[in-house]
Amino acid sequence: RVDFVHDVMLSTSCADISFASPLSFDVTVKSGPATMADMYKLYSYENDLCVMTLTGKEIRQYLEKSYDGWVTTMTSPDDHLICMNNRDASRDKFFGLKKPFYNLDTAAGIIYDVDVTKPNGERIVIKSMADGTQLDETRTYRVAVNSYRAAGGGGLLTKGAGIDKAQLESRITWRGDHTLRDYIIKYVRKHSPITPKTHNNWQFVPTEWTAPAAMRDYQTLWGERGSVEI
C-alpha cells in the first residue's frame, strides 16, 4: 500500500523522489470495484500533495532520521530489528512500534540499503536513482511529500535534513489543488484496474541477519495477523 501511494505521488507531481509512510497496518482493500470507503481506508488523512527542493545530502539525512525511529542497531543475528515498545500491540495505537508509524517514511525514486549494524545517522547507503544514475549530494532534487511533512511534521525535515522550520515554506515549489486522497481517486479512475506492485527499491542489510529478525519481530508484534507490509 505504501508503494501504491508512492506511485500516485510520483505520477501526479512528476517529482524525482517521494517520501511516504504507512498510515495503518490493519487495512485491507478487497479485489473488485473500489468504493469511496476504500479510498478513505487507503488514505485517511486530509493532507495535500507538495513538491519541495532538497539536496541529495538532505534526502539521505531525512531517511537517516526516519529509519533511526524504527530500527535498532543489531550487534548479532539474535537481536531485534524493529524498535518495539513494551505495551500490548493489540491495544496499542502504534501497533507495538516504539515510534508513530506515520512518521516512518520510506522513499521511492532511489535505490538504497539500510545497514542496521551501523549506529544512528550512519545507516543509509543510497546506491543510485531509480534510473541507475548516481544521486549527487550537492545537487537539488524535486521531492514529493504530504503537507504534514512539508510543514515539519515528524521532524524529518527539521531534525533530520537539518532545515530551519522557518525555511520550509520557501522550499515548496508546488502544492496540489486537491488532497492526496483526491489524487489517489483520480489515479485509480485513470489506471483501473489497479494491481499494486512492490518497488523492492530498498532493503535492510545484512540480509542474513535482517530477514530472520524481521520474521521474528513481525510474529512478536502482530502474531497470527502475519507479515505486515512496511
Predicted regions: what they are:
Residues R1-I230:
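Catalytic centers of hydrolytic enzymes
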